Amino acid sequence: KYAKIKNIDKNLVARLELDELKLSSITKTIIEITKLRDPIGVILDKWKRPNGLKIKKISIPIGVIGVIYESRPNVTVDLSCLCFKSGNSVILKGGSEAFFTNKIFVKLFRKSLKANKVNMNYVQFIERKDRKVVSSLLKDMRNYIDVMIPRGGKNLVKKVKELCNVPVIGHLEGICHTFIDKKVNTKMARNVVLNAKMRNVSICGATETLLIHKDCPKKKINLILNELKNNNCLIYADNKVRKIFSGKLKKATNKDWRKEYLDSKISVKIVKNVNEAVQHINKFGTMHTDSIITNNSVNANYFVRNVKSSIVMHNTSTQFADGGELGFGGEVGISTNKLPPRGPVGLNQLVSFKYHVAGNGQIRK
């Protein structure tokens, strides 16, 4: 209510808002995480050497995880649960927008730890709001924090990646694409595109650019674009699309291919084939999530193999780019790093490992 009175951006308000449905979703996530298998102490691999040495690769906690995040109060709960379940301590620095909500969630979590005779400091919350705290976390905590996870807008993530002197797990932007091939099921293409863009426009898995094969029937293109327009989506299209479409569309510029709108807006472009679609995605995308809609298995396989993103999809919505939806039981974020972890970082990705080497007196020659 206060945010609306102060005329704060509607997308930010949507992320801050906690209604009964969102609280129910948070509770459901907690329950799901408690049911997941303990990821610590798992034998990931084992083998025996010719000299009799027995080697095991065993999962262990990372250690202390620092998290700097904005807006979404559910992140406080997700991160606390996932870090604790994976045997890690977590230091939370939430945004000022949700300060009091975050504080209450952490208080409840720490109270629960104490009631179960567990060290409350597994979950810590930084209550100071000044920006010097963030700089200190990034520059001065190398001996205390093992990995940093930023959750928020491009500027926050960029700052963390530039200033932090410990490994960072995260992504700058979610410029996600959906490519419609020439042979598709019309109803499926229409439903998937609408969901990928409009289900929730403010999440990083929302499709921001729609690519369409040049031989896709004009009738199908008009049907799909009209579905978006009828749902109040503003379309920025290249000249080829504007000639095909029966109504009026905004003209796209080269800048639109690099935009993460996080709004009811989408850029649309005609491409020659699946190869050009892949080239466009690898040039303008952010290695987050990209999907192909096609009945052609050869094109689908080519797309999946050659798109460089951490999540590639076939005949489904990019909005499934979420740890909970992929069965991870929640996530601390999505990593677009080329080194692991990649994609949704859930419980099983919040671990490191060590090698246990057992012998019976062997010495190296």
Would you name each region that the model predicts?
Residues 1-55:
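N-terminal Rossmann-like NAD(P)+-binding subdomain of aldehyde/semialdehyde dehydrogenases
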Residues 253-365:
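Conserved C-terminal structural/oligomerization subdomain of aldehyde/semialdehyde dehydrogenase
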Residues 22, 26-29, 61, 101, ...:
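General structural feature for long, well-ordered alpha-helical segments within catalytic domains
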Residues 71-74, 78-89, 108, 115, ...:
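ALDH superfamily catalytic-core signature
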Residues 35, 43-183, 187:
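Rossmann-like NAD(P) dinucleotide-binding subdomain of oxidoreductase/dehydrogenase enzymes
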Residues 63-67, 82, 88-90, 121-124, ...:
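Structural motif
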